[in-house]
Amino acid sequence: MAESKNGKNYCYKYPRPAVTTDIVVFASHKGTIKVLLVKRGNEPFKGKWALPGGFLNEDETAGECALRELKEETGLDLKPNQIYQVHTFTSLDRDPRGRTISICFSAFVDYEKVAGGDDAAEAQWVSFADLPDLAFDHEAMCETSLDFMRTIMMAYRYCNTVVAQGSKSMNPKNDGE
């Protein structure tokens, strides 16, 4: 039996931090970028706005966890091919309950009605420009996800331009020959 710095015993050599997923869901509504938030129904940060998310079960992948938590907390039912894994947040103090690593996902969806469920007291679309003070490090997740989605959209536009010009311009050896 190994013992950690905080006195907990483990049946393996190293302590295991908790793993969570969070998902930043964007939608465009009336010319404004919106972010899907939930109001926390439990401590820590009870009553504070946060991203949909939660703890990873032992029998699911990180993507499955993000999709499950999103559906449980907002009613929004996305498919695996609609989400992107954006970044892993590992700050030592990101969760007051203990060492927690969060895998952040993101999606851009059509705007639709949502409702709070499970441990989320409410779910609501909020303008990205008017984000309230968020629980945990969720503001950083929103900013990182927005940068990521902008990059994806620029790459998509570039690929469409290359395809429209034909495959010749994709191979520099063929240019001018």
Regions from the PLM with identified roles:
Residues K5, C142, S169:
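Alpha-helical and His/Cys-centered functional microenvironments
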Residues N6, K30, R97, A115-G116, ...:
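Feature targets compositionally biased, intrinsically disordered low-complexity regions
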Residues L56-I152:
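Unchanged
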Residues M153-C159:
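Charged phosphate-binding loop/patch that engages nucleotide di/tri-phosphates or the phosphate backbone
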